[in-house]
Each structure stands twice: as structure tokens, then as C-alpha cells.
């Protein structure tokens, strides 16, 4: 491999919004702030988050729903 053309591969700290702190290696060069991680992601925890599904989709479904279905 050529010398001097590859980025530095350093240890950084990745901090999740749930408070989980991980030491990882990356070429980013600075610490990361994550929204979700393996300890708080709904897929891994089995818990479902409440997500507001309002707005345009609900308005569309209400407008074009067939009476008597569901």
C-alpha cells in the first residue's frame, strides 16, 4: 500500500441519546452523537415507540376510504 494516502484510523467515542457510551475505531476523526444504538433501538429492545402518524396520510385515507370496509 502507498504511504500517506490513507486516512487515520483512530479510536473515538460514540455517545447515544439514551446515555450509552461506546469506544469505536473510525476514520471520522471526532466524537459522534448518535440518535439510537443497539440498547435503545426498538428492533433490539422489542419495545415499540409511539410515533405520531398524523397529517397527509391520514387525511388521504379518510378522504378515499370505502364506507363499510374495516
Swiss-Prot record:
Q: Enumerate the GO terms in the molecular function aspect.
A: metal ion binding; rRNA binding; structural constituent of ribosome
Provide the residue positions that the database annotates as binding Zn(2+).
Answer: 16, 18, 37, 40
Names of required cofactors: Zn(2+)
Family, similarity comment: Belongs to the bacterial ribosomal protein bL31 family. Type A subfamily.
How is this protein organized at the quaternary level?
Part of the 50S ribosomal subunit.
Q: What does this protein do?
A: Binds the 23S rRNA.
Q: What NCBIfam families does the database record attribute to this sequence? A: L31, PRK00019.1
Could you tell me what this protein is called? Large ribosomal subunit protein bL31
State the organism of origin: Klebsiella pneumoniae subsp. pneumoniae (strain ATCC 700721 / MGH 78578)
Q: What is the lineage of its organism?
A: Bacteria, Pseudomonadati, Pseudomonadota, Gammaproteobacteria, Enterobacterales
Gene name of the encoded protein: rpmE
Amino acid at each position: 500500500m502507498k504511504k500517506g494516502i490513507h486516512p487515520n484510523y483512530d479510536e473515538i467515542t460514540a455517545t447515544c441519546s439514551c446515555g450509552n457510551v461506546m469506544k469505536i475505531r473510525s476514520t471520522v476523526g471526532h466524537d459522534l452523537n448518535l440518535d439510537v444504538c443497539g440498547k435503545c433501538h426498538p428492533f433490539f429492545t422489542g419495545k415499540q415507540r409511539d410515533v405520531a402518524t398524523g397529517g397527509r396520510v391520514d387525511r388521504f385515507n379518510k378522504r378515499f376510504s370505502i364506507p363499510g370496509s374495516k
